[in-house]
């Protein structure tokens, strides 16, 4: 088969860049999108011996499934690197689909991406690298950064005891994905590379176009892979949870209507309530035991504190006393100042903390992550209880 101009361009570029560089072995997670594709290409350019790895998570279409598998395989062929597909459907079903379903049934609003990062993606990638023995590192296309602990010496962070590796926000604040990575361990950080961490999104697209990557003009995915597969989160919920009729009740006690399951609601929700009231009403809380959706005026949605459970300290040792943090309680929201207090009267005092906000926050949602920062350093995070 005759080589296209793009084939020759890639071949010449990477062969010339690898002649003088020492080879290191790395596994790159490939979804078939432009970010992971460019990550692989940049690592080849930098002299790594790269192998692409794609996890088959769900049957059917989606960036993590059929189309993504084809694009990832084609990219590896273009780059002249090996490509491996792992069937991870069973672990994804157990660790993400099942736990997401259980969380909705409890009246929480879960964070499937964080579940997947902790228990599927990085776990599967690291295990694969370890089993190959000669592969020392893994990489993904996340917009986040990793630094050695010495980096913190340049900052005013004397109140923290830092671990060997620090997780930082991505340089592009509009694309920063560190919020979803709060559950990573030091073992993972010590072997992890984020090739796009210092880049802006527009630079990513330009670089991919310059290199002639087949995914360079592929539209960016805006949804969870669950949403891409099922069409919407609503359809996912309908498929996995049986409807159960209950009441929609104003916090003053007045019954305003009925619903077909608390799994269809989230704290702060206004649309889709199907009730009549002179003023706009919002979901205030969900009572799983009584199967009641409580609604209230917007002013009633504010909370000054929250209990955070299952806290993982990524970049610092567990604090033994209260600390001042910048807390981010949902993706895309701005961090807010707060005080974090260890709770010693819980069964597991090392993972449960009280977060007191400097200013009251609206729609603090159980099941979402509260992630703690000091400037650009991600200290740790946990689940809002």
Curated annotation (Swiss-Prot):
Cellular compartments per GO CC: cytoplasm
Annotated site (Interaction with tRNA): 142, 368
Record key words, sorted: ATP-binding, Cytoplasm, Disulfide bond, Nucleotide-binding, RNA-binding, Transferase, tRNA processing, tRNA-binding
GO terms classed as biological process: tRNA wobble position uridine thiolation
Keyword tRNA processing tagged: yes
Location relative to the cell: Cytoplasm
Key word Disulfide bond present: yes
A Pfam family this chain is assigned to: tRNA_Me_trans
Coiled coil: none
Main location class: cytoplasm
Chain spans, region Interaction with tRNA: 175-177, 330-331
MF terms (GO), sorted A to Z: ATP binding; tRNA binding; tRNA-uridine 2-sulfurtransferase activity
InterPro entries per UniProt: MnmA-like, MnmA-like_C, MnmA-like_central, MnmA-like_central_sf, Rossmann-like_a/b/a_fold
EC number from the UniProt entry: 2.8.1.13
Membrane spanning stretches: none
Binding site for ATP: 29-36, 55, 141
Disulphide bridges, residue numbers: 116-225
Catalytic activity from the UniProt record: S-sulfanyl-L-cysteinyl-[protein] + uridine(34) in tRNA + AH2 + ATP = 2-thiouridine(34) in tRNA + L-cysteinyl-[protein] + A + AMP + diphosphate + H(+)
Active site per database record: 116 (nucleophile), 225 (cysteine persulfide intermediate)
Similarity comment: Belongs to the MnmA/TRMU family.
NCBIfam families: PRK00143.1, trmU
Role description: Catalyzes the 2-thiolation of uridine at the wobble position (U34) of tRNA, leading to the formation of s(2)U34.
The protein's name in its UniProt record: tRNA-specific 2-thiouridylase MnmA
Protein source organism: Prochlorococcus marinus (strain MIT 9301)
Gene coding for it: mnmA
């Amino acid at each position: 088969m005759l080589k296209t101009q793009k084939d020759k361009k890639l071949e010449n570029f990477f062969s010339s860049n690898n002649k003088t560089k020492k080879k290191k072995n790395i596994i790159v997670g490939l979804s078939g999108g432009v970010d992971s594709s460019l990550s692989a290409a940049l690592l080849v350019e930098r002299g790594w011996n790269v192998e692409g790895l794609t996890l088959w998570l769900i049957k059917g279409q989606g960036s993590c499934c059929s189309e993504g598998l084809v694009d990832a395989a084609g990219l590896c062929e273009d780059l002249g690197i090996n490509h491996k597909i792992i069937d991870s459907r069973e672990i994804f079903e157990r660790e993400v689909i099942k736990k997401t379903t259980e969380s909705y049934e409890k009246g929480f609003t879960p964070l499937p991406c964080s579940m997947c990062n902790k228990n599927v993606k990085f776990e599967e990638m690291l295990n694969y690298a370890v089993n190959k023995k000669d592969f020392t590192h893994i990489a993904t296309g996340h917009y986040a950064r990793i630094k050695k602990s010495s980096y913190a010496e340049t900052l005013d962070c004397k109140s923290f005891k830092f671990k060997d590796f620090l997780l930082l926000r991505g340089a592009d604040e509009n694309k920063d994905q560190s919020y979803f990575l709060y559950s990573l361990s030091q073992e993972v950080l010590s072997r992890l590379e984020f090739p796009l961490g210092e880049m802006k999104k527009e630079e990513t697209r330009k670089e991919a176009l310059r290199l002639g990557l087949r995914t360079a003009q592929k539209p960016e995915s805006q949804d969870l892979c669950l949403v891409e597969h099922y069409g919407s989160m609503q359809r996912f919920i309908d498929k996995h949870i049986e409807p159960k009729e209950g009441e929609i009740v104003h916090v003053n006690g007045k019954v305003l209507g009925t619903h077909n399951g608390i799994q269809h609601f989230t704290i702060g929700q206004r649309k889709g309530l199907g009730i009549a009231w002179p003023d706009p009403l919002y979901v205030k809380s969900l009572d799983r035991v009584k199967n009641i959706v409580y609604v209230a005026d917007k002013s009633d949605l504010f909370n000054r504190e929250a209990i955070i459970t299952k806290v993982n300290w990524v970049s610092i040792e567990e604090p033994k006393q209260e600390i001042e943090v910048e807390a981010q309680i949902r993706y895309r929201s701005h961090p807010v100042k707060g005080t974090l207090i260890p709770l010693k009267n819980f069964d597991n005092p090392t993972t449960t903390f009280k977060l007191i906000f400097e200013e009251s926050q609206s729609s603090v949602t159980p099941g979402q992550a509260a992630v703690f920062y000091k400037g650009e350093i991600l200290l740790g995070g946990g689940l809002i209880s």
